[in-house]
A protein has these predicted regions:
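Cytosolic-side transmembrane helix boundary signature
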Residues: 382-412
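Small-residue-rich transmembrane alpha-helices
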Residues: 34, 241-243, 329-392, 433, ...
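Mid-to-C-terminal secondary-structure elements
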Residues: 121-134, 146-270, 465, 469-475, ...
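Membrane-helix entry/capping segments
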Residues: 1-4, 9-19, 49, 237-284, ...
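Membrane-proximal extracellular/periplasmic loop immediately following the first transmembrane helix
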Residues: 35-103, 208, 212-222, 230-235, ...
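Intracellular coupling helices
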Residues: 6-12, 16, 291-332, 392-403, ...
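Generic structural signal for small/hydrophobic residues in well-ordered secondary structure
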Residues: 11, 42, 58-60, 83, ...
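Hydrophobic alpha-helical transmembrane segments of multi-pass inner-membrane transport and secretion
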Residues: 13-41, 271-306, 334, 338, ...
């Protein structure tokens, strides 16, 4: 207790220094804990299912044009059932899933809900290992039935039982709730709030579900024993070949295999790169915060030496002094943690936006060990190093010039801080430049003012006429898919029937290409049936060097070549594209609005509600949809920006503390030099020389690290910037300039001070 009492007295005496420590640790802990919590969130994906080691997802590897592709979690609808039937001794159950993308809505009492939906069969919950709260999963055999999650049921019905209630799917199709299941956590690759019966697809002909088409499903297998995985994989090929012969020499073939679901998300290259970079940022920030704490503690040695000497003269052992420093560090960390909690509560929405996850999902009982480990490691580093240094000082040395021998320690800590600042600034610049590239590069069409919606009208021509007559609409068109949806795939063959590649295919009205502002580089636009437009990539892969106009594609005549444009995003390579002209389509309606766009979009949706009160028709902005494709990059940019600001503040506090300590330690020397004629510039050079010598190699290491990590991060983009060495030279110059200016500003006052004051105070 006596040690704790002396610790509190010491903390109260050094309020200014301790405030700096608290601010530094608060910032470091806040960002560091959040970064590592996000890493743990990503690495714990799909770990919530019962006996998850026995649950596998079916991977498909496509062989197109003689080339083996990457594994994808997509299957033909009959595949899971066929595998389960073929290996009954090792497989407990199987299920097939279709994810409903886009704005799928449910209405209850005329209130619109947009939950995450999937379609699956009666074995879904058994296979996945999801608890049923009420209802019989066998009800999913029947079409137009559904199960809902606990939280969705509570949100819609409160404490009332949802069983037997009817919801309107997309405001037109009644569906009956037959059961409730436990909530799916956010760190799930198959997140859903509603499960609709798979037989609904067949009844309403939503999808093709045979062996010849419809590879847009997901398949899951639950093994009886996890050790049977290799045995099952070895028997899959002959089972599938009974229905789908494997003939890669014909240009197209598929191989299926099982993979434990727990490793699918974490093994994705994009996730691995993100985890690596976030872990590096977290380590850098926490390490810098800890080193800054150590630096400030060591810098206070001159002020605290006599107090330590007095304690030792009064019988305090090295262990007593050491424990006092541990108590001091523990109290400061506790205060910092309280402030971290206050910041999290007050900036909850911003933090959840940056983390792409709720606070509750980031800090679960399963991942609580992550922040605990961060705190413990920080306590060990920040407490043990200065505690050991102070407690090991002999009494005979306490009142001498012991602090002068700590210059190496302090310069090493400064070196690490400067390295961290440069590294994070380099990463930030790479992210900013890449984000600017993918958001400002011309995309090959004009999305400005365009809004779209998916809907099947009773009369498509009448719907188009109604849209044209609206005062806020300047033009309308229609297509099978939106321009950023990726479209469906169709094999392109040569004259011998060998598949060369798969093209992205979209059907559209004749005015769609000029409506979207797509540039035609060769030929003309569509103006009749049996005509097609292809893009430059299509022509390149066909190896047509003599032009494409007039050539045949399937039963269509190519009348023009479009300039390349992304059909997904700049994450993916440019695909070959073909547009087929049709006189009438009834699926994805497009309008080009007059200015002001946002106001007119609201007016458009209000008009649609008035014209079609019994249907769910909501247009959304194409420009905003394109921006949403890069939401993860934008969030990562903001997170790195926050990390840079935090690490810069921490490092500046450490630098200022170091300079203050040097000024205090060498004040008499500076005064004597000034009395002997030293100018201000000489004093500035005296105090800043060591800092620049420390900073220069640190900045070099930081920029080199940022360069190599930046290359790794850019690997996820098909369209990416080319890193230039001179960018990193400029970054190094900027960091050195910031360090030098900070040092000059801090030293300027003492360099101009009357030397008599310093000599009198000695």
């Amino acid at each position: 207790m006596r040690q704790l009492y002396y610790t509190f007295r010491t903390l109260l005496r050094g309020r200014g220094v301790n405030l700096t420590k608290i601010i530094s640790l608060t910032l470091g802990l806040l960002v560091g804990i959040l970064l590592f919590a996000r890493v743990a969130f990503e690495l714990s994906f799909d770990g919530h299912y019962k006996e998850v080691d026995r649950l596998c997802v079916i991977n498909a590897v496509y062989y197109v044009g003689g080339e083996k592709g990457e594994a994808h979690q997509v299957v033909l609808a009959p595949v899971p059932g066929a595998i389960a039937e073929g290996v009954p001794d090792e497989i407990e159950s199987s299920t097939v899933v279709r994810i409903r993308y886009g704005d799928n809505t449910l209405f209850y009492n005329n209130v619109r809900q947009c939950p995450k939906m999937i379609l699956s069969d009666s074995l879904f919950f058994k296979t996945m290992g999801i608890d049923i709260i009420s209802g019989d999963p066998r009800e999913l055999v029947n079409p137009e039935t559904m199960f809902v999650s606990r939280s969705f049921a509570r949100r819609i019905f409160g404490d009332e039982s949802p069983i037997g209630k009817t919801l309107l799917y997309n405001r037109t199709l009644p569906m009956t709730i037959k059961g409730v299941y436990e909530d799916i956590p956010e760190n799930s690759s198959l997140y859903h709030e509603v499960v609709i019966s798979f037989s609904t697809i067949e009844k309403h002909h939503w999808e093709c579900m045979g062996w010849e088409c419809g590879d847009s499903f997901q398949g899951y297998i639950r093994l009886k024993n996890a050790s049977d995985l290799d045995k099952v994989n070895s028997r899959i090929d002959p089972i599938i070949e009974k229905h789908l012969p494997f003939r890669p020499e014909e240009g197209f073939a598929i191989r299926y295999s099982l993979q434990p679901i727990r490793g699918v998300h974490a093994s994705a290259p994009v996730i691995q790169k993100m985890v690596m970079i976030m872990s590096l940022l977290g380590l850098v920030i926490l390490f810098i915060a800890a080193m800054n704490y150590v630096l400030i503690s060591i810098s206070s040695l001159a002020r605290r030496a006599k107090a330590i000497g007095v304690h030792k003269c009064n019988g305090a052992s090295e262990r007593n002094i050491f424990s006092m420093f541990l108590w001091e560090t523990g109290i400061i960390i506790m205060i910092s943690l309280i402030l971290v909690g206050v910041l999290v509560l007050n900036f909850r929405e911003d933090i959840e936006y940056l983390a792409s996850a709720s606070i509750g999902a980031l800090f679960t009982w399963e991942t609580l060990w992550v922040p605990i480990c961060v705190i413990v490691i920080l306590f060990i580093v920040a407490g043990i190093i200065p505690g050991h240094l102070f407690s090991s000082i002999p009494v005979t040395h306490v009142f001498r010039n012991y602090t002068e021998r700590k210059g190496g320690w302090k310069r090493t800590l400064l070196f690490l801080q400067f390295t961290g600042v440069t590294f994070v600034l380099g990463i930030l610049c790479v992210v900013l430049l890449q984000y600017n590239r993918i958001t400002t590069k011309p995309i090959g069409y004009n999305p400005e003012g365009v809004a779209f919606t998916y809907h099947n009208f009773a009369d498509s021509e009448s719907a188009l006429d109604n849209l044209r007559r609206l005062p806020m609409v300047s033009d309308v068109s229609d297509s099978e898919s939106s321009i950023i949806s990726g479209y469906g795939g169709l094999a392109v063959t040569d004259e011998n029937g060998i598949i060369l590649f798969t093209t992205r295919l979209n059907a559209c009205l004749y005015n769609y290409v000029p409506f979207m502002g797509i540039r035609i580089k060769e030929g003309r636009n569509l103006n009749g049936p049996d005509q097609a437009l292809v893009n430059e990539e299509f022509v390149r892969q066909m190896r047509w060097t003599d032009g494409a106009v007039g050539k045949k594609y399937e039963n269509f005549t190519i009348v023009g070549v479009m300039e390349n444009f992304p059909v997904n995003s700049y994450y993916e390579e440019q695909d070959p594209v073909a547009f087929i002209g049709q006189q009438q389509i009834n699926n994805c309606y497009h309008v080009r609005l007059k200015q002001p766009y946002e106001e007119n979009l609201r007016s458009l949706n209000k008009s649609m509600e008035e014209m079609y009160p019994t249907e769910d028709i909501v247009f959304k902005s194409l420009s905003y949809s394109i921006e949403d494709q890069y939401q993860n990059v934008r969030r990562f940019r903001d997170a790195v920006m926050l990390a840079f600001v935090v690490i810069l503040l921490i490092s500046l506090m450490g630098l200022i503390g170091y300079i203050s300590d040097e000024i205090q330690r060498r004040s008499k020397e500076i005064a004597i030099r000034k009395v002997n004629g030293a100018e201000v510039s000489h004093i500035l050079n005296l105090l800043s020389k060591d800092i620049i010598w420390t900073a220069s190699p640190a900045v070099l290491f930081g920029t080199a690290g940022a360069y190599f990590v930046g290359i790794q991060w850019l690997g996820q983009f098909a369209e990416r910037i080319s890193l230039q060495v001179y960018w990193f030279v400029l970054i190094a110059i900027v960091v050195l300039a910031m360090i030098f200016l900070s040092a000059v500003i801090k030293v300027w006052h003492i360099a101009n001070e009357n030397p008599v004051k310093s000599i009198k105070s000695e």
